[in-house]
Structure formats: structure tokens, C-alpha cells
Regions:
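Hydrophobic core of alpha-helical transmembrane segments in multi-pass integral membrane proteins
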Residues: 4-17
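Active-site beta->alpha N-cap acidic-glycine motif
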Residues: 18-104, 118, 122, 151
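Catalytic grooves of carbohydrate-active enzymes
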Residues: 179-202
Length: 202
């Protein structure tokens, strides 16, 4: 009975660690850069999107702000002009896998490696950018993700402020308030191009 309880508890801990990217349990992950001083990093996941990405870029340009876009490879190939605009306007790009598949964390490390490299090469071909920034789908990490990150010489990027901007019925004001309450030196803010309409007041 005791052994079974220990096994169950250990399994729960491992599962919990997989979904808590800030713990860095499986792979060293940048979630905050205190050395950056009184600045924060804006990051946008799941793009590019033909409707939302131009609006996000317009807003950033108006405010003179730079951000990092973690792009999905298949979407990048469908909307190469948006990838080129992101790069041309001085924003950083990162890899958010080829399709953002729900089953990505369950793949073999070699399949993950191929996925990351495919996305990296696509971004290079489209916009001439060579990125080693990587954010795993849903922020899930495990030993397979760790091996793929190492093989591809990627730098895993997490977040220290989760906006929850994709939740239904979440207003722009609620999202902004949540972010404002959690601001701090060098924090990394997670936002979304797809499903994150609250940020732009849609």
C-alpha cells in the first residue's frame, strides 16, 4: 500500500512539473530576466494570423514597442508576408512548433527535433531569420522536450506573467488589470495572436 502511494505521488509530481514551465524541472527555461532592469518582454503565441497579426503589429508600431512572436510553422508558410513584416519591423521571432499539435508533448524526442528544425528552416527561408528561441505548446515540458531542445541548440522561453487572454468572456480591462498587477523587472508576458482578442478590445 505504501509503495503504491509513493508511486502515485511521484507520478503526480512529474505530471505537475510538466505543466509548470516556470519550475524548469526538465529543461532550463527563461521565464524572467532580472538583469534587463525596468523593462518587460511582450511575447505573442500562435500566429501569424491574417486578421489579428496586422492589428497587433500596427499597435506595437504606434507605441514604438518591440515584441517576440512565437510562430507556428504551418501558419507562417500560409502567411509569409506577415512573417516578413514581423522581421522587417524589428521584432524577434521564435519557434512554436510546426502545427501546435495537442499531442506534441507525447511525441518522441526525435520527432520533436524534426518538428523544431522544420519550423526554424521555414522561418529562415521566408524572412531570413535564424531563430533559436523555442516555446513548447501549452508550455508543457518533459524529458523528450528537453532532449529536443538540446539537440536543436534551442533556448526554451517560458513566461512569468500569464495574461489568460484567451479565456471566453474575459474583457480587455480584466486582462490589462491582471498584467498590471504582476509587472516587475524583466518579466515575460504571455499573450496570444489567436484567441487573444481581449487584448485589442475585440
Amino acid at each position: 500500500m505504501y509503495v503504491a502511494a509513493v508511486i502515485i505521488a511521484a507520478g503526480f509530481v512529474l505530471f505537475y512539473c510538466s505543466y509548470q514551465i516556470r519550475l524548469g524541472a526538465y529543461v532550463r527555461t527563461l521565464c524572467r530576466n532580472r538583469a534587463a532592469g525596468r523593462v518587460v518582454a511582450l511575447t505573442f503565441d500562435d500566429g501569424p494570423d491574417p486578421e489579428m497579426t496586422p492589428r497587433v503589429l500596427d499597435l506595437l508600431r504606434e507605441r514604438g514597442v518591440r515584441a517576440t512572436f512565437f510562430l507556428v510553422g504551418a501558419k507562417a508558410e500560409r502567411h509569409p508576408e506577415l512573417v516578413r513584416r514581423i522581421a522587417a519591423e524589428g521584432h524577434d521571432t521564435g519557434i512554436h512548433t510546426w502545427e501546435h499539435a495537442a499531442g506534441f508533448p507525447m511525441r518522441s524526442s526525435w520527432a520533436m527535433t524534426a518538428d523544431i528544425l522544420r519550423c526554424r528552416e521555414s522561418l529562415r527561408q521566408i524572412a531570413g531569420v535564424e531563430t533559436h528561441l523555442f516555446r513548447p505548446p501549452f508550455g508543457v515540458t518533459n524529458p523528450m522536450v528537453a532532449r529536443a531542445v538540446k539537440r536543436t541548440q534551442s533556448r526554451c522561453i517560458g513566461w512569468s506573467v500569464r495574461s489568460f487572454d484567451t479565456l471566453l468572456r474575459r474583457s480587455r480591462e480584466a486582462v490589462a488589470e491582471r498584467i498590471a498587477r504582476r509587472l516587475g523587472d524583466g518579466k515575460v508576458i504571455l499573450l496570444h495572436e489567436v484567441g487573444g482578442q481581449a487584448v485589442l478590445g475585440k
